[in-house]
Amino acid sequence: MRRAEVQRTTLETMINVEFTMDGNGEFSGTSGLGFFDHMLTLFCKFGGFNLNLSCQGDLEVDDHHTVEDIGLVLGEAFSKALGDKKGIARFASGFYPMDEALMLIAVDISGRPYLAFEADFPPVLAGKFNYQMVEEFLRGFVQKAGITLHVREISGKNLHHKAEAIFKGLGRTLKVAVSVQGDELPSTKGVI
């Protein structure tokens, strides 16, 4: 079973993540940010991942440390759960709609962390969650997961719809990229 548990404790956050790659799409626990929990639920549902999150963050300051650190911890758990990467599809992409919003999500499980983020999120709050933290979460996740991720907004006006299309699309795209399709490492270099 592809599974990992990762903990991170700083002066700003205490986070524990239990992540199962081949799960049944369940999210449990809380980030302390209702909207962000909704996005993580979508990520898990459409990726078929199980995520149990325990988090204490300095939300009295703002949401930045909490969201970024969850991205870092989840990315590390994703990488550990993936293991040696033998047989995975590696690449996946798709267009994901949510009403008027349409996002392109493309991923390469390459061992090279890179985020290309072209989506417009002004500094507006959804509850206590700043929409600009969508990019910060993804940056942290990509850094520790060791993947290349492209997110491009094709269209969209409603910020909730745009964020939802990204998280659903990321889950679904990663589900395809981590699917096992053989037993060889998908690289001409022999390493990822």
From Swiss-Prot:
GO terms for biological process: L-histidine biosynthetic process. Its EC number is 4.2.1.19. HAMAP family: HisB (MF_00076). GO terms for molecular function: imidazoleglycerol-phosphate dehydratase activity. It is found in: Cytoplasm. The keyword Lyase applies. This is Imidazoleglycerol-phosphate dehydratase. Its main location: cytoplasm. GO terms for cellular component: cytoplasm. It catalyses: D-erythro-1-(imidazol-4-yl)glycerol 3-phosphate = 3-(imidazol-4-yl)-2-oxopropyl phosphate + H2O. PANTHER family: IMIDAZOLEGLYCEROL-PHOSPHATE DEHYDRATASE (PTHR23133:SF2), IMIDAZOLEGLYCEROL-PHOSPHATE DEHYDRATASE HIS7 (PTHR23133). Keywords: Amino-acid biosynthesis, Cytoplasm, Histidine biosynthesis, Lyase. Pathway: Amino-acid biosynthesis; L-histidine biosynthesis; L-histidine from 5-phospho-alpha-D-ribose 1-diphosphate: step 6/9. InterPro entries: IGPD_sf, ImidazoleglycerolP_deHydtase, ImidazoleglycerP_deHydtase_CS, Ribosomal_Su5_D2-typ_SF. The gene is hisB. It is an enzyme of class 4 (lyase). Belongs to the imidazoleglycerol-phosphate dehydratase family. The keyword Cytoplasm applies. Pfam families: IGPD (PF00475).
